[in-house]
Regions:
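Carbohydrate transferase catalytic cores enriched for Leloir-type hexosyltransferases
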Residues: 1-151
């Protein structure tokens, strides 16, 4: 089954009107908004997380999926490559064949699948609260040091 999360109803309606989709309609599950407390369970049971967004300022869902050990397929645009690093398969979101190819590769290549899981789990560590706090602390110390040198 394919879970389509947090997509506007008008987009789902448009999707379901597509002739090509009639064969798989029974396999689509679109619950709408998903509460944050339910996200980890969904990520943990997912084969992969597809995030073909065209524009994002950061992309927290990418990190959430990675933290749960779920391989990520995401856009090669905007902030996604910087956030995902090697922890995701990057695709052009406007090229459905690239999405299909990425899904097929993850399905058929167990080593590649496991590497994506491992890369994701490693990548997400860079964004821990501890690392973020240490980075801010370093910036503040550098500013303080620079100001003390100027006075």
């Amino acid at each position: 089954p394919l879970l389509i999360a947090d997509l506007k109803e008008e987009y789902i309606d448009a999707l379901l009107r597509q002739e090509q989709i009639t064969e798989i309609k029974k396999q689509l599950f679109y619950p709408g908004y998903i509460d944050n407390q339910d996200l980890a369970a969904l990520y943990n049971t997912a084969f992969t997380f597809l995030y073909p967004s065209l524009r994002e300022s950061f992309g927290i869902p990418i990190l959430e999926a990675m933290a749960c050990g779920t391989p990520v397929i995401t856009s090669h645009t905007s902030a996604m490559p910087e956030v995902a690093g090697e922890g995701a398969v990057l695709i052009n979101p406007e090229q459905p064949q690239q999405i299909a190819d990425a899904l097929i590769k993850l399905e058929n290549d167990a080593d590649f699948y496991q590497k994506q899981v491992d890369y994701g789990l490693e990548r997400v560590k860079l964004f821990s609260w501890r690392n973020t706090a240490e980075a801010y602390s370093k910036i503040y110390r550098e500013i303080q040091k620079k100001q003390s040198l100027e006075t």
